[in-house]
């Protein structure tokens, strides 16, 4: 399965539209005003799905998240923490599932692991007016975690520049 996360061009805050393989809007992520990055996630029917919020005043980029599957099948709660590394990106995910994420040196390609097995890959599409990421995943229950990780990655990249 595939998702396309595309940042909105005219937006006061970081906001994203997330499309499925057919080009239909599947989720909308809306940025909110605050001292640090904060996002709310909505499904295609504008129902609240969850939130992602950066912890302010920390040495490492840390995001707390709380999302519920739209079908009501479960909730993900935890944090995403960027580790200090020299050449590649390493992100630790503390939640009720065993996820980890590693990125390439320029920060354009990422691999997500669940229980030490590859569950998703992200790649940044270059030559677009806005930040655009493609997410490939196999298991539908990893979909919301992919969205959380992509939004956190983009916020980290935005903060570093």
Spans of model-derived segments:
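Intrinsically disordered, low-complexity proline/glycine-rich segments
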Residues: 1-161
């Amino acid at each position: 399965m595939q998702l396309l996360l595309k940042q909105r061009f005219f937006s006061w805050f970081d906001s994203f539209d997330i499309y499925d393989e057919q080009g239909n809007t599947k989720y909308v992520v809306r940025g909110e005003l605050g001292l640090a990055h904060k996002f709310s996630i909505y499904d295609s029917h504008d129902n609240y799905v969850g939130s992602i919020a950066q912890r302010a005043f920390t040495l490492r980029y840390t995001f707390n998240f709380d999302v519920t599957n739209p079908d009501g099948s479960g909730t993900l709660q935890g944090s995403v923490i960027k580790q200090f590394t020299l050449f590649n990106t390493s992100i630790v995910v503390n939640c009720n599932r065993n996820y980890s994420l590693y990125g390439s040196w320029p920060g354009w390609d990422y691999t997500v692991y669940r229980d030490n097995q590859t569950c998703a890959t992200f790649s940044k599409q270059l030559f677009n007016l806005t930040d655009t990421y493609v997410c490939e995943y196999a298991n539908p229950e990893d979909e919301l975690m992919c969205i959380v990780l992509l939004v956190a990655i983009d916020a980290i990249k935005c903060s570093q520049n």
